[in-house]
Amino acid sequence: MAEQPMIEMKNVTKVYDNGTVGLKNINLKINKGEFVVIVGLSGAGKSTLLRAINRLHDISEGDILIAGESITKTKGKNLRLMRRKIGMIFQSFNLVKRSSVLRNVSAGRLAYYPTWKTTFNLFTDEDKQRAYEALQSVGMAEKVYSRADELSGGQQQRVAIARVLTQRPEIILADEPTASLDPKTSRQVMEDLKMLNEKFDMTVVANLHSIELAKEFGHRVIGVRAGEIVYDGKMEDTPQSVFGNIYNGGKGKEED
């Protein structure tokens, strides 16, 4: 019996209100525990694809399933429950700058509480312990009581990763997590994502602008151009020429 995909996109198309086609007939399956990197030019549709998975962008046609359940058709409380399974890491970190690192990381537990409780950021001792352990996992425990705006960009991104770990999702979507970071810090962030993938068996899908990091950390590479998937293959089987095709316009799609 075939393994049920953790993420499945069926004939997914996204057309924006101004008529721009963000995604065009995307068909994609990602299995539990994979580390998938998505590459392509700026504006190719990478972020749209990623953000469609957890409904930050609603799609125009098709369906998206998370562990076999349609997130496209889910609403209200059930959508909130489904989103618990999906952690998001942004290029801009999305931290509350004037709050402590501990409070920012504890926010990963907000999806587990009713709205009234999240409004007041009422975290339990268990939540705070989870947050501290997550900070230890990414080497940031010594900053637990620092304000987020006192940290470097790389440190803020690692705090964002700790927040996702505190959430304990099954899927991590990382949208250009290293875009504003120097090479050394970028590698540290990717090592953190690798740790979440290997230690906690979290499925990681990351948009990356660095081909070097994509080749080093990805199990599988998906090339996107003009809203379409033009390549999908195992990283170890992907020659350098494929990246040129993805960025320069040649076709390079690999069938299973």
Curated annotation (Swiss-Prot):
Entry EC no(s): 7.3.2.2
GO CC terms of this entry: plasma membrane
Gene3D superfamilies xrefs: P-loop containing nucleotide triphosphate hydrolases
PROSITE patterns according to UniProt: ABC_TRANSPORTER_1, ABC_TRANSPORTER_2, PHNC
This protein's UniProt keywords: ATP-binding, Cell membrane, Membrane, Nucleotide-binding, Phosphonate transport, Translocase, Transport
Pfam families found in the cross-reference section: ABC_tran
Boundaries of every ABC transporter domain copy: 7-251
Membrane topology label: Peripheral membrane protein
Enzymatic class: translocase
Function: Part of the ABC transporter complex PhnCDE involved in phosphonates import. Responsible for energy coupling to the transport system.
Subunit structure: The complex is composed of two ATP-binding proteins (PhnC), two transmembrane proteins (PhnE) and a solute-binding protein (PhnD).
Protein name: Phosphonates import ATP-binding protein PhnC
Organism: Lactobacillus delbrueckii subsp. bulgaricus (strain ATCC BAA-365 / Lb-18)
Lineage: Bacteria, Bacillati, Bacillota, Bacilli, Lactobacillales
